[in-house]
Every structure is written in C-alpha cells, then in structure tokens.
Regions:
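Nucleotide and nucleotide-moiety/phosphate-recognizing core
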Residues: 1-156
Length: 156
C-alpha cells in the first residue's frame, strides 16, 4: 500500500486517532504499539517493540506490551479496522472470560480467532511467550492453540 495504515483518514481523522479516542472510554491508558523505526505519533503514548520481539509483527507488539506492563490485561485493536464501533468494544468486555488466554471475535471469513480485536489477559504472558519461543509467531495460531473465549460478531 505504501502508506502507514494508522494514518489513513476515516471518520474525519486519522484512523489511529479514531481508535485512540474510542478506546479511552474502556482503558485506563491507551498505547500505540509500534516498531522502533516508526513514529513518533504526536500526543499518543507508544510502546516500541522490545528487541527480542522486533520483526515479529503484531505478536511482537503484544508480547512487548505484556513484558513492559506484566500486570495489565490488554485490549488489542488493529489500527486498520475502520468499521470498529463502540458496540464492538462493549460486547468484547461484556462477554470477556478473564480465566482464558484471551477473548476474541470469530472472523466471519474463516471462523478463526481475530487476535487484533481481542482482550489478552495478563496471566497468559508466560504461555504466549512459551509458544513464541517454540516458533509460533502468528497471534492467530497462538489463540487457536490456547484457551480462548471466542465470540460471534453481531455485524460482520
């Protein structure tokens, strides 16, 4: 595409600002996960990928956040979901199972977990890290191979 998806404009503002504003209602603090060669993003708190997780895409960002704040549960939302709504986030929290590794929506395209529209629980860091060290670097595969609460999407 040649352009940072976080900066694409939807809803009259860059997508990253829309997501940030949406998540502020649900989170004590909102972070943007990014590679060390990206940004800075003015006015947004960022977590750079830790060196051991760099070059591992979204999973690198998830693990970096979990490592930096090990007691925090993580609402993970991709920056390229222009149709995500308040209702989407509210439903995720309402149907959340904190005993699981994560709570995630089921993709309407392939019936697999959506790891970038999910709540990843703090207690799962060790098991997620173990799978990463065993060579599993896809967040979707990690959720498939973990105890994940899967929820249906109301409006695919």
């Amino acid at each position: 595409m040649g352009q940072d998806k976080a900066l694409l404009e939807f809803h009259g503002k860059p997508q990253i600002e829309y997501i940030h504003d949406l998540l502020q209602k649900y989170c004590d603090k909102v972070f943007l996960s990014k590679r060390s060669d990206q940004g800075p993003f003015k006015g947004l708190a960022c977590i750079d990928d830790a060196p051991e997780f760099s070059d591992h895409g979204p999973l690198g960002g998830i693990l970096s956040a979990m490592k930096k704040y090990p007691k925090a549960d993580w609402l993970v939302i991709a920056c390229d979901l222009p149709f995500i709504s308040d209702e989407t986030i509210k439903t995720l929290f309402t149907l959340r199972d904190p005993q699981k590794t994560a709570t995630a929506y089921i993709s309407t395209q392939d019936a697999l977990p959506e790891p970038l529209c999910a709540i990843w629980e703090a207690h799962a860091y060790g098991s997620v890290l173990k799978l990463f060290k065993e060579g599993m670097h896809c967040p979707r595969k990690i959720l498939i191979n973990s105890h994940t609460r899967l929820i249906d999407q109301k409006d695919p």
